[in-house]
Amino acid sequence: MTMELEEIVYKYALWNAVKHNGQAQVGPVVSKVFAERPELKANAKEVVKLAEKMVAKVNAMSLEQQTAELQKYPELLEERKKEEKKTLSPLPNVKGTVVTRFAPNPDGPLHLGNARAAVLSFEYAKMYKGKFILRFDDTDPKVKKPIKEAYDWIRDDLRWLNITWDLEFKASERMSAYYNVAKVMLEKGFAYVDTLSDAEFKAWRDSRNKTVYKPRTNPPEVNLELWEKMLNGDFDEGKAVVRIKTNPEDPDPSKIDWVMLRIIDTKRNPHPIAGDKFRVWPTYNFATAVDDHEFGITHILRAKEHTTNTEKQRWVYDYMGWEMPTVLEFGRLKLEGFMMSKSKIRGMLETGSERDDPRLPTLAGLRRRGIIPDTVREIIIQVGLKVTDATISFDNIASVNRKLLDPVAKRLMFVREGVLFKLEIPQEMKAKVPLIPARQEFREIFVKPGDEIYLDKGDVEEGKVVRLMDLCNVKIEGDRLRFLSQDLESAKRMGANIIQWVKKSESKSVNVIKADPNKDVEEIRGYGEGYFETLKPGDIVQLVRYGFARVDSISRGEITMIFAHE
């Protein structure tokens, strides 16, 4: 193996180590080498052997040293900076101003799955310098009953994602618009009032040899009279509905004469905004068709499970002579290891969990856990408008989050269940510890003979030689840390692990909570270095040799953090 090859393997080991918090891995290093020099695949065994050697060498360095060494290879620094950003594919049928919308039902918090439509709709509006509308789809005060607080939850979640909107409205405040269109459709014979039972309608709908369905044959004047009775409260809930006339022979029974408007007893089921002001409420498909037309929506981005709804809404457009927006459908987005069902999430909320419970895939839960908004946006844009279902594991989320946080997050020392030792050193020493390596920012910690030092319980072993990160090499003897040497080379020769440490006189009590959705919540108590004093709730830092964590609260001198990921 030539010196040139050693240099290639070495630089990629450095690159991989700095990318992964000081710990390079052989596999990615070998892949990079083969990408640069494909002819070396013929000597794969030798390359792997050399990679193992170089990875061991690089991993023995401190992150500060690795970062400094990487400066020798500017081409790799550039590669780190300009990691390719995926952009969205162009929209079809763009004729004028693009207008998109996001129409959540405010019956629960946003999660990663339903945030997809919000991010894509907003990004496309921005891409074409168009308009983005927020429409609250809140016309079902009984089955999918809106939650009053959820309107603000959704606004907060969208703002967190850096999504802004040009216009906002609630469907529940547009009842007169739905009534007006319904009246026109009744007048023109496109719809009818059905006062028969649901069972009678289904018997006709599902029969192979369809006879005449009496309500369907009523003239417009009869339907208009029945419509007025519906509005005036002459019918109880379930006793009358407005149906749209569709194809009676449609192979999908759900599309046959579907309900446009129905009566809901809002004395029993008051709407959180409108109260009991209205009794006749539009269904999702009717209200959506009317609003999308009246607000000039040009492109609708929705999950493919809405295919049937698109076909239903087309009947309204065709009858009214409106131009149908371009509909773009995408597959489901499943977050592996988390519950995505809105009903299950709502169940947890009803039994005491908060919407920002870090075990949940809600945007608030991800935010509290230390996932940043750019991570969510990048993942959604990466998946884009794929029609096939996509599964995103938390590892995928962590990988993107790590990539985005790594250049900006502060590295701080934290020891779990700290064990106290007396530091025996010959004179006062200074540790110059990397704070943000990518920016060449450092902090200084001064220690003197006799200072008390906390070590992580997992690093404590009688007689073990360790290197206190960026300070010196010591041997653990009872409750003492006996000084051996100060240089890093000595630590390498002795095979000493580089470990974090916390000076007792500057220490802060820290409680790290691990909230894995598939495990019991775990609390890790320990101590953080003095720099923790500068932190405030919401700050995300990297705990050296642990991973990323977000400051959740600070109370009576104790800092509580939520662990994000390694």
Swiss-Prot record:
Main location: cytoplasm
UniProt catalytic activity: tRNA(Glu) + L-glutamate + ATP = L-glutamyl-tRNA(Glu) + AMP + diphosphate
Domain of life: Archaea
InterPro entries: Gln/Glu-tRNA_Ligase (IPR050132), Glu-tRNA-synth_arc/euk (IPR004526), Glu/Gln-tRNA-synth (IPR000924), Glu/Gln-tRNA-synth_Ib_cat-dom (IPR020058), Glu/Gln-tRNA-synth_Ib_codon-bd (IPR020059), Rbsml_bL25/Gln-tRNA_synth_N (IPR020056), Ribosomal_bL25/Gln-tRNA_synth (IPR011035), Rossmann-like_a/b/a_fold (IPR014729)
Mitochondrion as UniProt keyword: no
Transmembrane spans: none
EC number(s) per entry: 6.1.1.17
Molecular function terms, GO-annotated: ATP binding; glutamate-tRNA ligase activity
Top-level EC class as recorded in UniProt: ligase
One cellular component term from this protein's GO annotations in UniProt: cytosol
GO biological process, one term: glutamyl-tRNA aminoacylation
Keyword Ligase: yes
Keywords: Aminoacyl-tRNA synthetase, ATP-binding, Cytoplasm, Ligase, Nucleotide-binding, Protein biosynthesis
Motif segment ('HIGH' region): 104-114
Family stated for the protein in its record: Belongs to the class-I aminoacyl-tRNA synthetase family. Glutamate--tRNA ligase type 2 subfamily.
Cited function: Catalyzes the attachment of glutamate to tRNA(Glu) in a two-step reaction: glutamate is first activated by ATP to form Glu-AMP and then transferred to the acceptor end of tRNA(Glu).
HAMAP family from the UniProt entry: Glu_tRNA_synth_type2 (MF_02076)
Record protein name field: Glutamate--tRNA ligase
The organism of origin for this protein: Metallosphaera sedula (strain ATCC 51363 / DSM 5348 / JCM 9185 / NBRC 15509 / TH2)
